[in-house]
Amino acid sequence: MMKPEFFCFSGFCVYFLFLQVVVSSEKLRVTTPTRHLLARVGGQAELSCQVIPPHSVMHMEVRWFRSGHSQPVYLYRGGHKMSEEAAPEYANRTEFVKEAIGEGKVSLRIHNINILDDGPYQCSFNGSGFIDAAIMNLNVTAVGLETEIHVQAPDADGVMVECNSGGWFPRPQMEWRDSKGATLPHSLKSYSQDEARFFYMKMTLLLTNMSHGSIICCIFNPVTGEEKQTSIILANELFNRDRIWMESLASIVWIMLSVYILYIICFYWRTGCASGCLSKCFCVVTSWPVQIVHLLFCTGTFFAIYLPHRSRVSLSDPQFPLYNNWITELLFVILFLTICFALPIILLFIQFQFTSLTKWEKNKDGIMDQPRLGKAHETSSLYRKKTGKSWEQEK
C-alpha cells in the first residue's frame, strides 16, 4: 500500500507542471518590430512579426490577412504554403521568410507594391493551444513624375497660371509660393483619381502684376515629406494686356476722328464755304459717314468705361477664365468688323464727294463762261456789220 506522502508529492509535481505550462502559455504573445511601414509603388515591403519570448512556430499556423477580405494574403500551415487559399491578387507576389522560424520570427515579403496594397495587415499564430495576432499598417506612397505649369492667355483681370501634376499617392498638398518663399493664395484647387487610385492635382493662380517675381508651384507628400517644385518667370508684357487694348482702342478712335476732321476740311476747301455756313456744317455733321464715326466713338467709350468696372464672377467659378476671355475677345471682334466695314465706305464716300464737287465746279465755270461767249458773239457780229457797211460805202 502506497504511502500518503507519495500521493501528495506526485500531485504537487503534476500541479507544478500544469502551472508551468499555463504560465508559459500566458507569457507567449505576438508582436511586430514596427506598426507602420512605408513602401513605394513598384517596390517591396516586408511585414515581420514574432513570438516572444522566443518560441518555435514551425508547426503552428501562420496567417497574414486583411480585415474585410475573405481570403488571406498568405497562409502557412503544416510547414507548407497553402497557395490555393490565398487571395489571387497576391499570387506570385509574396515570399515567406522563415530563416528564424525556430526563434518565432517570420516575415512576409510583398513584391511589386501597388496602391491597392495600402492599409492594415494582421499577422496571427495558431497552434498548441496558443493563438494571438499583431496588427501593422502598410503605407504605400507614390511621387508624381512630372509637374507642369501652363499660362493661359491674359485677359482683362490678369494672367491665370495653372499647375498640373499626376501620379501621387496619397493625396498631396499643393501651394503657390513667390521668390521669397511666401505662400500665395490660390484661385482654385481640384483633384481627381484614376482607376489605379493615383491622384491628379490641379491648382490655379490669378496674377494681376509681376511684383511676386518668379512663381513656384510646390507639391509635397504628407506621409514622406517629399517635395517637388516647379517655377516659372512671367514676362512683364503679359501684364500690360489692359494697357495694350486701351491704346489700341484709343488709336482707333483717333483714326476715326482724323477721318472725320479730314472730311470736313476737304468739304470746306472744295466748296469754299466760310466759317459761318452753319447749314452746310449741319449737313456734314448729320451725314451718315459721320454718324458711323460717332457710333464707333460712343461704342469704344462705353467699353472703355464698362470693362474695368464690370461685375465679375467668383475666382472659384470653373467658368471664370471663359467669362473673362470672351467679353474682351468680343470687343476686338466687333471693333475689327466695324472698322473693316465702315472705313472703306467712308473713304469711298469722300472720294464720291470730291468727284461730285469737281463736276459741280466745272459746271459752275461753264455757266459763268456762257455770258462772256454771248458778248463776244455780239461783238463779232457788230464788227462784221460795220465792216460790211464800210466796204459798201467805199464801193
Curated annotation (Swiss-Prot):
Disulfide bonds join C49-C123, C163-C217. The keyword Cell wall biogenesis/degradation does not apply. Glycans are attached at N92, N139. Residues 270-287, 351-395 are cytoplasmic. Expressed in skin, thymus, testis and, to a lower extent, bladder. The chain crosses the membrane at residues 249-269, 288-308, 330-350. It is found in: Membrane. Keywords: Disulfide bond, Glycoprotein, Immunoglobulin domain, Membrane, Repeat, Signal, Transmembrane, Transmembrane helix. Residues 26-141 form the Ig-like V-type domain. Residues 26-248, 309-329 are extracellular. The keyword Transmembrane applies. Pfam families: C2-set_3 (PF22705), V-set (PF07686). Coiled coil: none annotated. Residues 142-233 form the Ig-like C1-type domain. Residues 1-25 form the signal peptide. It is a multi-pass membrane protein. GO terms for cellular component: membrane. Residues 371-395 are annotated as: Disordered. PANTHER family: BUTYROPHILIN (PTHR24100), SELECTION AND UPKEEP OF INTRAEPITHELIAL T-CELLS PROTEIN 7-RELATED (PTHR24100:SF51). Encoded by one of the 11 copies of Skint genes clustered in the D1 region of the chromosome 4. Belongs to the SKINT family. May act by engaging a cell surface molecule on immature T-cells in the embryonic thymus. This is Selection and upkeep of intraepithelial T-cells protein 7. The gene is Skint7.
